[in-house]
Amino acid sequence: MGCPVKSKFSLVDKPTLKIDQRLLGVWKFKGDSNLEDSNYVNAVEITQYSTTEYQLSVSQVSEIYEPSTFVFRAYLADFADKKWLIVNNEEDNTNYFFLIGYLEGNQLRISELGIDMTSEDISSKEAFRKYVNGRPFYDKNSFWIKQ
């Protein structure tokens, strides 16, 4: 997981999907669609927090990672007919959004939601959801391997 757009709004009010056991474990960054082989976060351990939530513990970072925390809560949700991993930073109550494009065996491909929150008039959760539903923009794809 890189440094995607962060928002004080979320795509959904609560998790809409149960834990996907295939996501549990240690994931290492293997590259992205920009042919970069380093990321803000290079390894993360995903554990089960509850029946609908994960705990993400960042275990390996690059020198450009400026964390407010190394531990996040996350959950899965269906939004706009897509499966999302929504990651919450409880320290500053912001959310990050990753579209799950592929999860098979020990391979995961995610796409970061890319919205310029400063240039858009997004001042409510309804406006945020409408914007993402109407014209989502995905930043880079990143590829991860489960250890």
Features from the language model and the residues they span:
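Short edge beta-strand/loop segments characteristic of extracellular beta-sandwich folds
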Residues: K28-K30
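Calycin-type beta-barrel ligand-binding domains and close structural analogs
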Residues: P4-D20, D32-V41, Q48-Q147
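A glycine-anchored, Pro-Gly-centered beta-turn/N-cap motif
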Residues: Q21-V26
